[in-house]
From Swiss-Prot:
F-type ATPases have 2 components, CF(1) - the catalytic core - and CF(0) - the membrane proton channel. CF(1) has five subunits: alpha(3), beta(3), gamma(1), delta(1), epsilon(1). CF(0) has three main subunits: a(1), b(2) and c(9-12). The alpha and beta chains form an alternating ring which encloses part of the gamma chain. CF(1) is attached to CF(0) by a central stalk formed by the gamma and epsilon chains, while a peripheral stalk is formed by the delta and b chains. It catalyses: ATP + H2O + 4 H(+)(in) = ADP + phosphate + 5 H(+)(out). Its EC number is 7.1.2.2. GO terms for molecular function: ATP binding; ATP hydrolysis activity; proton-transporting ATP synthase activity, rotational mechanism. PROSITE patterns: ATPASE_ALPHA_BETA. Pfam families: ATP-synt_ab (PF00006), ATP-synt_ab_N (PF02874), ATP-synt_VA_C (PF22919). This is ATP synthase subunit beta.
Length: 458
């Protein structure tokens, strides 16, 4: 059934249909003679619906015919999507021909019911020391990478994808939501060079896209991940960046004429976040482990967008500018980062005690910093001097060369097993390496490499 455009305001388009054939909310409409797809957001009465454009509205004019597809936007799913880059509509944008999918699924679906959901306490080893030690990931859990501009969220995410694809040979889905096109391009070539592209499906809705596109692209990626999960696989879903999803929602909300709430965000912020996050879950057939980069505006974690995201996560990895300034990468704050899995019943006594020991030493060092700044190191007791020395070694040992950063650093990347991570940090806490210079611990993998580096420095 067709209607016609009656009003265009930016990305918002009003379409009039016969009263007995008004489209449902979330139905996809196609503007005739163009490739433009619209998604119905509101029914205004008198047969008029308000829709958001999924692409540019240039060249559209009043009176153009619009055809109702009668269903929501549907996208290709399954193995055909691996190694391909798609847009929000599931169309290929990598110039490698058709996707050739066997099946398509609508992007709007209900979250799995309570009966279908399954919880798991199995740990997912990432090979990144600071994450495995202080904020371990659960298989089928949700992780947030929080950080301001330029502290390394995307690089950390790329390293996680590389490590998990190489070491665990699982499928991953990457949804680029409102990020830089350059990063998307770098990411694609990085995956190609690491030979893991055939295990990753990529869905991009970058910064230059209209808000409707950026609001829905996360759902497109999630739908592809859900299909892998329903086929009995353990899949990883990477979203970069969840803040841009919220931001796109804010833009759409304003365009639809809703009254803004705190800090200008949409009044439906919590609900929109919930709709996405509740679908990212594990069922009895398979699991979705999700890693989401969360941009923190002005480094303020109390901003409504990151604050709303917090409540949905099992683990939070906080990237701190103060650590990046010291030249320690990954710039993860071991005192601010948390995980539900860091529990002696889940990770075991040894891991738990080592992690808490590391945090205790770093916390004490943080408290002593003021005294050192005013009075100097000489005024500290011998015990405190030892604590400071160990803390500085731990701080440097938390750094690690990344595979995806080899191009910038020139240092080969390192994957460190959980067993080696615990052994190294426990050794520093026990004082086994008190005689080594702290510089030996900087940018190495295992503790044995630190010892070797110290010997070479002599």
């Amino acid at each position: 059934m067709s209607g016609r455009i009656v009003q265009i305001i930016g990305a918002v388009i009003d379409v009039e249909f016969p009263r007995d054939a008004v489209p449902k909310v979330y139905d996809a409409l196609k503007v005739s003679d163009t490739e433009t797809i619209l998604e119905v957001q509101q029914q205004l009465g008198d047969g008029v619906v308000r829709a958001i454009a999924m692409g540019t509205t240039e060249g559209l004019k009043r009176g153009l015919d619009v055809v109702n597809s009668g269903s929501a936007i549907s996208v290709p799913v399954g193995k055909a999507t691996l190694g391909r880059i798609m847009n929000v509509l599931g169309e290929p944008i990598d110039e490698a021909g058709e996707i050739g999918e066997d099946e398509r699924m609508p992007i709007h679906r209900k979250a799995p019911s309570y009966a279908e959901q399954a919880a798991s306490n199995e740990l997912l080893e990432t090979g990144i020391k600071v994450i495995d030690l202080v904020c371990p990931f659960a298989k089928g859990g949700k992780v947030g990478l929080f950080g301001g501009a330029g502290v390394g969220k995307t690089v950390n995410m790329m390293e996680l994808i590389r490590n998990i694809a190489t070491e665990h040979s699982g499928y991953s889905v990457f949804a680029g939501v409102g990020e830089r096109t350059r990063e998307g391009n770098d990411f694609y070539h990085e995956m190609q060079e690491s030979n893991v592209l055939d295990k990753v499906s990529l869905v991009y809705g970058q910064m230059n896209e209209p808000p409707g596109n950026r609001l829905r692209v996360a759902l497109t990626g999630l739908t592809i991940a859900e299909k892998f999960r329903d086929d009995g696989r353990d899949v990883l879903l990477f979203v970069d960046n969840i803040y841009r999803y919220t931001l796109a929602g804010t833009e759409v909300s304003a365009l639809l004429g809703r009254m803004p709430s705190a800090v200008g965000y949409q009044p439906t912020l919590a609900e929109e976040m919930g709709v996405l996050q509740e679908r990212i879950t594990s069922t009895k057939t398979g699991s979705i482990t999700s890693v989401q980069a969360v941009y923190v505006p002005a480094d303020d974690l109390t901003d409504p967008s990151p604050a709303t995201t917090f409540s949905h996560l099992d683990a939070t990895v906080v990237l701190a500018r103060s650590i990046a300034e010291l030249g320690i990468y990954p710039a993860i704050d071991p005192l601010d980062s948390t995980s539900r899995q860091l529990d002696p019943l889940t990770v075991g006594e040894e891991h738990y005690n080592t992690a808490r020991g590391v945090q205790g030493v770093l916390q004490r060092y943080k408290e002593l910093k003021d005294i050192i700044a005013i009075l100097g190191m000489d005024e500290l007791s011998d015990e405190d001097k030892l604590t400071v020395s160990r803390a500085r070694k731990i701080q440097r040992f938390l750094s690690q060369p990344f595979f995806v950063a080899e191009v910038f650093t020139g240092a080969p990347g390192k994957y460190v097993s959980l067993k080696e991570t615990i052994r190294g940090f426990q050794g520093i806490l026990d004082g086994e390496y008190d005689d080594l210079p702290e510089q030996a611990f900087y940018m190495v993998g295992t503790i044995d490499e630190a010892v070797e580096k110290a010997n070479n420095m002599k």
